[in-house]
Amino acid sequence: MSALTSNFAPHIQAMPGWRTSLGHSPRDMKSAMTSFDRFCSSHHPGETVLTRQLATAWCQDTATGTWSAHRSRAVRELGKYLQLIGAEGFIVPSAWIARPTRGLPHMFTDEELAAFFQATDSIGADYRSPFREYTIPVIFRLILGAGLRPPEARRLRRHDVDADNAMVAIERSKRNKDRRVPVSGDLAGLLARFDHLADLRRPGREWFFEAQPGRQYSPAWLIASYHRCCELAGGIAPASTPYTLRHNYATRTLMRWAEEGKDLGAWLPYLAAYMGHQKYSPAAWYVHLLPERLAATGLTSVAGIIPAVTS
C-alpha cells in the first residue's frame, strides 16, 4: 500500500491482516482505503475518529452528488475493524449500501466463439508484449475450457499446471480458497505445448503466463487483449469482458447436461464446486440464462429442473 498520511494510517495498514484471516483478499480494499486516507489528509487532517459525518462525507461523491456503494462497503469494513480492536468507529449500515445489479452476460454463439479464437490465433508478435502471440490464444482457451476466473488464469504459477495429469491447481483464489480443476485432454495438451515453448524462451520462470521475468500479466493487459480479439472477430460482444468466457463455460456445461437428460438440481453443486463458488446460488443463477434453450429440450416441464435463486 502506498504511503499513508492520515491519522487512520495505522488502522488502514493493519486492517488487511484481519480481513485476510476471514478469507478475504488483502487487495480488495487497497484502492478504496488509499483514497480514504488521501481524503482525510486533505479535508479532515485533524480527525482521529471515524464518525458518521466523516464516513458519509467520503461516501458522497461531490462531483456527481451520488452515493458510492464501493466506498461505503470499504469504510463499513474499516468501522467494523475499529470496533473490533476497541476503538471508536461508525459502521455504515448495510441497508445504506445498494446491492449491485447483475446484468446478463453475452452468450456466444458457436460461430462467434470460432471467430473469437480465430482472432486470438491471428495475433502477431510485438516487442512491447513478448510472447503474446502464444499467450493470448492459450489463456483465453483456458478460461473458457476450464471456467476459470480471469485472475485465476493470470496468477497461475508454473507448478500449478500439471499437464501430464490434466489438472490445474488454483491456490488462494476468491476468499483464499484452493481447489483442483481437471481439464480436458486437448486443453492439457495445449498447456503442455505452451509450457515447453515458454520454458525454451525463459527457463525456470515463476509464472505459467509470464509477461516479464518474475512478473505476471496485468488485468489491464488481459482486458485489452480480450477486446482486441472481439474487435478482430467482427466487433462481437462489445460490452463483454474476459469473465464472459467463464460464464459461457457454465452455460454450455448446463446445456450439455440438460441435453443428456441429467437432473440439473442434482448436478449444480458439482458445477459450483468446480468453478470455486462457496454457495449453490451463483451456479444456479446460470440456469436462468437459458430459458429458451432449456425449453427447446423439453426438460423444463420436469418439476424442480430450475432451482430457485434466493440471493
Where are these regions (language model features)?
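Conserved catalytic core of the tyrosine transesterase superfamily
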Residues: 1-311
